[in-house]
Amino acid sequence: MSEKREMLRHFLATLAYRTQKALRGAPDGFAVFRAGNQARTPHELICHMRSVLGYARTYFIGGVYDRSVPDDFALDIERFHDMLSDLSSRLATDSRLDGTTEEKLLQGPFSDAMTHAGQLAMLRRLYGDPVPPENFIVAKISSENLTGDQPAPESPDKIWPEAPKK
């Protein structure tokens, strides 16, 4: 496997980790929270993230990927992680890309999905239940773990000036 593909696999694992960080312990009602002005709900974001990654997968398998429609939130999160695993395995086996490059996958659908992971974290704050900060450099992220079962923070920030007031 090329270094580019190893890096993309790590990026996908980071996406899995950061998405789960934003979702872990979310209160009831968070999945359908709409911040306003037709912004996507967290549930819609997870489906959109799966859709853009499904689009990326078409460069490996051909065809088209239809937009994901929200179903059950927990099931859609599982499907999102399944898509991450599928893409990672294609990168690991040096499956041929047709019509794009590794760089284009990173600048397009992979970065799009990571942007939405950040939006999930922002929506948690707007919902009144912010995600505690951590030092991501020391996070236990593994290219072999694309599941929803991500490790707890290795180095959570001890000082959190913008923590919710109790």
Residue ranges, per PLM feature:
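Short, contiguous alpha-helical
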Residues: 5, 9-23, 30-68, 99-166
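Helix-adjacent hinge/juxtasegments
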Residues: 58-98
